[in-house]
Design a protein with these regions (language model features):
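Residues that define the transmembrane beta-barrel architecture of outer-membrane proteins
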Residues: 17-21, 59-65, 111-115, 124, ...
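Gram-negative outer-membrane beta-barrel transporters
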Residues: 3-95, 174-176
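C-terminal beta-signal and adjacent terminal beta-strands/loops
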Residues: 86-95, 120-177
């Protein structure tokens, strides 16, 4: 129960209710022979009792949306894939006032998008590929609160709700045995 006291990790039996309801819908459509589109949406309603109050679970995105497109050339030698992922915002644990009078962190984190893409060249028994993840370059602004003083009372390394790495690129070879 992080909302009770930011300096303590309280592990005890739940005194109240908790639940997790998820609704998901997805669809895939072949627009034409070589192009497949997929869309998905997931809505999360996750709550638990904190300090006697039924509240939204912290650090949990309210929704996630996904859209993918995959195109393979008619000869099957080239394939390009792209993904757009929308991550909904959510609640942060209860903030507190720092010694300088400012708030430790915002009450909520905002929604963000991520884009990834990959290009593949297929051969008879192997393939090569290049791609990138998090092409928008979005990262969580503050990943470790109080990082300048890891022994201080305001040090907090566990409030991760989004990407901590920026754009990443990769290349590789796949061998079919």
């Amino acid at each position: 129960d992080y909302d009770s006291d930011h300096r303590l990790i309280c592990i005890d039996n739940l005194q109240g209710r908790s639940y997790s309801h998820t609704f998901q819908i997805d669809a895939s459509y072949v627009l034409f022979k070589s192009l497949t589109l997929t869309a998905a949406y997931r809505l999360n309603d996750v709550k638990a009792t904190y300090g006697g109050i039924l509240r939204e679970r912290p650090l949990t995105s309210k929704y996630k949306g996904l859209f993918t497109a995959s195109y393979k050339t008619p000869d099957g030698r080239w394939q390009v894939d792209g993904t757009l992922q929308l991550n909904g915002g959510g609640r942060m644990p209860q903030p507190y006032q720092l010694a300088d009078g400012t708030q430790s962190w915002n009450r909520r984190f905002k929604a963000y998008e991520q884009v990834s893409a990959q290009l593949t060249r297929w051969f008879k028994h192997w393939s090569v590929y290049v791609g990138g993840e998090n092409l928008t370059g979005f990262t969580q602004h503050t990943t470790i609160y109080g990082a300048d003083n890891p022994w201080g009372t305001d040090f907090e390394p566990t409030l991760i709700w989004g990407p901590v790495h920026g754009r990443m690129f990769y290349a590789g070879v796949r061998v079919n045995i």
